């Protein structure tokens, strides 16, 4: 839940700044056309900027150490395994990195299939068997091959646009209703209007998070299927079972955990970016 509230708070700050900037620029957001342009620019713009800098952000945020020259047999095996799987999946070799964390996790990020980063935690690298790590790597390579970074960015852009547009349309309706019942016809006033927009942004933002999480869970099942093809179904099941027995994740930011192997648990499954590990194992066994 903390991840969701943090995401909503960040979006609220962005929308507040966006509203001020658009007012300074004189963009009329009182009409449907102007409002839609405003919503699309900031809805998709923010999502694609995040995608464009995703590799850089991942390296800085997680302290990823990209392997350029393997220092030992473990790193050499890691790079060779990703290279083999990338060739099988028909994509350009991603950058391979390690980040220091005791959690059992890995993630993929990057602006495109042929410009990606696959990173694993030190806890996973030295706490799982080679077969299990191979399956985890195959899962991340499948995310890249499936174009999940771009897909989730497009979905995020659409729901961002919906949140910005819908919140201001509803706020406008409320403002007009208040004005029609006000002798002076002034409506809510600037500060009250902004407060209403803020609350509506939060409410619609929660709905948007549920939608994005739903599509993220679907992509996880697809990545599991892809990993089963690249590394073998039994290896993937064993890897998920090992993750199920490990400690709960907590170090990875939400922007990267959506394409990680092991997602954070939530009180509400609707807000989870990953299906429960038990369901993922059951889906693989049934396939």
Curated annotation (Swiss-Prot):
Which co-factors does it depend on?
Zn(2+)
Catalytic center at which residues? 140
How and how many cofactors are bound, per the record note? Binds 1 zinc ion per subunit.
Q: Where are the transmembrane segments?
A: 4-24, 33-53, 154-174, 195-215
Report the InterPro entries cross-referenced here. HtpX_protease (IPR050083), Pept_M48_protease_HtpX (IPR022919), Peptidase_M48 (IPR001915)
Say which enzyme class the record assigns.
hydrolase
> In its UniProt entry, what is this protein called?
Protease HtpX
Tell me what organism the protein belongs to. Shewanella halifaxensis (strain HAW-EB4)
């Amino acid at each position: 839940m903390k991840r969701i509230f943090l995401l909503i708070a960040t979006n609220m700050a962005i929308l507040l700044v966006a509203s001020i900037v658009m007012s300074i620029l004189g963009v009329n957001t009182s009409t449907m056309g102007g409002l839609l342009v405003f919503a699309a620019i900031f809805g998709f713009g923010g999502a694609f900027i995040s995608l464009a800098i995703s590799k850089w952000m991942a390296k800085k945020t997680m302290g990823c150490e990209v392997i350029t020259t393997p220092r030992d047999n473990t790193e050499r095996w890691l790079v060779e395994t990703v290279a083999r799987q990338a060739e099988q999946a028909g994509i350009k070799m991603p950058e391979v990195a390690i980040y220091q964390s005791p959690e059992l996790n890995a993630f993929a990020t990057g602006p495109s299939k042929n410009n990606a980063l696959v990173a694993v935690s030190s806890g996973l690298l030295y706490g799982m068997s080679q077969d299990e790590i191979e399956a985890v790597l195959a899962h991340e390579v499948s995310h890249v091959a499936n174009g999940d970074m771009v897909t989730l960015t497009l979905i995020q852009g659409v729901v961002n646009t919906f949140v910005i547009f819908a919140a201001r349309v509803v706020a406008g309706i409320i403002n007009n209703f208040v004005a029609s019942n006000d002798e002076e016809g002034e409506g809510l006033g600037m500060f009250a209007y902004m407060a209403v927009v803020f609350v509506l942004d939060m409410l619609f933002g929660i709905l948007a998070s549920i939608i994005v999480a739903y599509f993220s869970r679907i992509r996880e099942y697809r990545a599991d299927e892809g990993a089963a093809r690249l590394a073998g179904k039994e290896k993937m099941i064993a890897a998920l079972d090992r993750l199920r027995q490990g400690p709960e994740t907590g170090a990875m930011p939400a922007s990267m955990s959506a394409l990680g192997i092991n997602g954070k648990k939530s009180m509400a499954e609707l807000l989870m970016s990953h299906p429960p590990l038990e369901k993922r194992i059951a889906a693989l066994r049934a396939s």
